[in-house]
Regions:
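Enzyme catalytic cores with a strong preference for nitrogen-chemistry domains
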Residues: 1-241
Length: 241
C-alpha cells in the first residue's frame, strides 16, 4: 500500500475547462496498483490555494501570484487498507493545525493519522518545527499516533501521547535531504477498538464552558464593583447633604 499526494481534476458538466474543479488530494493505492481511495483537502491556504471573493471582486486575482485556485473537499475520507483491517486518515499540508478538523478524521476504528506536506517553502527555519508541535497536539487530542511525511521538511513519528519518537535526518544530521524513515505504529486489535478521548468525542465543549463560566464570573465581579461604587457615591451625597 502507498499514499501519494497530487493535484486532481473533475471535469465540469458544461464542457468548459474553466469550470473544472481542481483539488489538492491524497490517494490510497493498493499493492496491485489500483486507486482505492481519494481524499480532497478541505482547509485550503488563502491566497496560496484559493482566492477569496474572486467571483464578486475579480480584480483581486491580479494582486496574487496564483492564476486560479483549488476547490475545497467536502468530507473526511478514511483510508481502509483492504482485508488488513487497518484504517487511517490523511491531513494535507497545514490541516494538522486545526483541532476541529482533525477530530472529524478519527473514530474508534482509526489506527493513526498521516500528514503529508511540503515545508520546503519555509526554508530551514523554525516553521516546520512549529507545525510539528501543532501536530503533536492533534495526536494527544485524539489519542492516536501521527506520522508526518514531508517531501521537504520535518518527517517524523509522534505517538498518541504527543512524544516525538522518530525523526528523519540525513547523513549530515539535517531534516532536509533525500532519504526515508521507517516507523512502527501500534495498531488496533480486531476485537478491541481504540478508546476515543473526551476531546475527540465532544470537541471544545469543555473549553467553551470554561470560557463562558469565566466570563460570567467577570461580569458578576464588575457588576458587584459597580454596585459598590454606586453605594459609595450615595453615602457621599448624603453626608454632604
Amino acid at each position: 500500500w502507498i499514499i501519494v499526494g497530487s493535484d486532481d481534476m473533475e471535469p465540469a458538466g458544461s464542457g468548459n475547462p474553466r469550470d473544472n474543479n481542481y483539488f489538492n488530494s491524497s490517494f490510497l493505492i493498493s499493492p496491485r496498483g489500483n486507486l482505492v481511495e481519494r481524499y480532497c483537502k478541505r482547509q485550503l491556504v488563502i491566497f496560496g490555494e484559493y482566492i477569496p471573493l474572486v467571483k464578486w471582486l475579480p480584480f483581486i486575482k491580479y494582486l496574487t501570484p496564483i492564476d486560479g485556485g483549488f476547490t475545497a473537499g467536502e468530507a473526511a475520507t478514511p483510508f481502509h487498507l483492504g482485508d488488513t483491517g487497518i484504517q487511517l486518515s490523511t491531513l494535507i499540508c497545514f490541516e494538522d493545525v486545526f483541532p476541529q478538523l482533525a477530530r472529524e478524521y478519527v473514530t474508534e476504528n482509526t489506527d493513526f493519522l498521516v500528514n503529508i506536506t511540503n515545508d520546503g517553502w519555509f526554508g530551514e527555519g523554525a516553521a516546520q518545527w512549529q507545525q510539528g508541535a501543532a501536530a503533536a497536539f492533534r495526536a494527544v487530542e485524539n489519542g492516536v499516533p501521527l506520522v508526518r511525511c514531508s517531501n521537504t521538511g520535518l518527517t517524523c513519528l509522534i505517538d498518541a501521547n504527543g512524544r516525538l519518537l522518530q525523526i528523519f535526518k540525513d547523513a549530515k544530521g539535517k531534516i532536509y535531504g533525500p532519504g526515508f524513515l521507517r516507523v512502527e505504529i501500534p495498531l488496533n486489535q480486531p476485537s478491541n477498538h481504540r478508546i476515543r478521548t473526551y476531546y475527540n468525542q465532544h470537541g471544545d465543549v469543555f473549553g467553551v464552558s470554561c470560557a463562558v463560566y469565566s466570563a460570567l464570573l467577570l461580569f458578576r465581579r464588575f457588576r458587584a464593583q459597580a454596585t459598590m461604587d454606586e453605594s459609595s457615591e450615595s453615602r457621599t451625597s448624603l453626608e454632604k447633604t
